[in-house]
Amino acid sequence: MHTSHVLPRAALPVALGLLLASGHAGAQSNPSVATAPAPLSPAELSALVQQQALQIQQLEARLRAVEGGAVPLASAPAAATSAAPAALEQRVVAVEKAQSKAPKVSWSKGAPEFTSADGETVFRPRGRLFVDQSSTSGSDYGTRNLSGTEIRSVRLGAEGRYGIIGYAVEGDFADNAVAWKSVYATVDHTLFGQAADLTIGNRLNDRGLDGSSSTSNTPFQDRNVVGTLVMPQRGLFGVGLTERVYGKGWHASLSVAGNDLNNSGSDNDSLTWATRVHWNPVLSKDATVHLAAWAFHEEIPGGATGVLRSSAISGHFNDEIKIAPGTLVGTDRSNAWGVEAAGFFGPFWTSGEWGTRNLRGLDANGRYDLDHDAWSVGAGWFVAGAVPAYTAKAGTWGKVKVAEPVTSGGKGAFELKARYEDVDYAELPTGGTGNAWTLGGNWYLNDYSRVMLDVVRWKTDNRSGAYVGPDEGTTFNTRLQLVF
């Protein structure tokens, strides 16, 4: 409270002494000067002293800032203010020059991000933790009415950059196993005058709004059925090359990849060509419209597993509640495509996706040509504290920014959400059908953590597996999520 008074008082006698001494020395060293400068009036002298004191005070504050000092000016010895402004300026410049060469550290993403002084080298650890609880009731099969907890995902890794070369390495501990996820390098460049990057390695598919987004950012605990079922035999990831080009409100990608990094190496890889394009016809602070389409073609080796996938329609924990696709042997290729639409209007969002996959192969009955499809629609409303997060660069869900985090004394952000999704395997020889309504809410504690509730009302009608025929029930899923 007294900082602004101590320095002027300390500087006053110093400045007066310097002025008088310089005036006296000047008079003695220049006796031949006919006209001496007019003496300063008391008011002018006082103004000059105050100006000098203010300059010293500003330099001291600047020096404390760059040195990180915390000693209040009032507690410092008065003699510390007697240094001449020029000497103090030199000291500040020297400290600032040394500090400019030191690496910078930012915590804006929840973990320390280290950046070299020239900005060319960046490194930060990254990871996530999903702790889930699930409870199901209402099924006609008692073995489907399960309750329990699981650590859905513990993911640890790092990402960084050396100039135009970026990288990410990440492993996931889930389902009592360890699996590699993102393991790739990128090279930034330009293509047709637009920003672009080439990915080499194991990276998440660019396929659908939910399918292209991390589950750390999707509004629901699990991706919709288009993202989880209408996919290549290799799954969500694949080792290969992906070229992406970015424009204002659009992007396009083309990739070619084999199986993901966790392939056992005991058989041939599948080979998948894929593309996706998104466009934002409306892109502003108050409203954004997302339109997109995607497609892939894959060549599947003989004896490959995982060509068809069961839909965990009630959430990840309960493995008994799935829509069974049945058995299909001899598939040697597939083609798939889908469309997306979404809108973000202030605190509201809505989205819809549809996808279909055509399977071709040879079984005991000869050649076949069969389809299966899925679709989903959803909507949400941020009641308070934030707005929907969307990344226009890649056409994906983004990370929600909380205005008043709980960790800073605020209330966080609250979101209400609803989704309907439908799966149809009926054209396959023994494929089932099913659908689900999901209602819930998310409480965002800060930019890095949230508590989620999904209440799923599901129906299945399987023609194969342990639970044949119509069945329905309700599943309550909760999650504590931490991502950095």
Tell me the role of every PLM-derived stretch.
Residues H2-S4, L40, G142, V187, ...:
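Outer-membrane beta-barrel pore domains
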Residues W107-P301, H372, S376-S408, E415-K417, ...:
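Outer membrane beta-barrel
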Residues A25-R128, V383, V387-K401:
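N-terminal periplasmic/intermembrane-space "pro-region" immediately following the signal or transit peptide
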Residues E44, E60, E67, E89, ...:
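Acidic-residue sensor for enzyme active/binding pockets
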Residues H2-L12:
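Bacterial N-terminal signal peptides that target proteins for export
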Residues A53, Q58-V66, R91, E150, ...:
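Secondary-structure boundary/capping motif
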Residues A11-A21:
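Bacterial N-terminal signal peptides
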Residues S29-S32, A78-A86, G157-A174, G240-D267, ...:
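Glycine/serine-rich loop-strand microenvironments at binding/catalytic pocket rims
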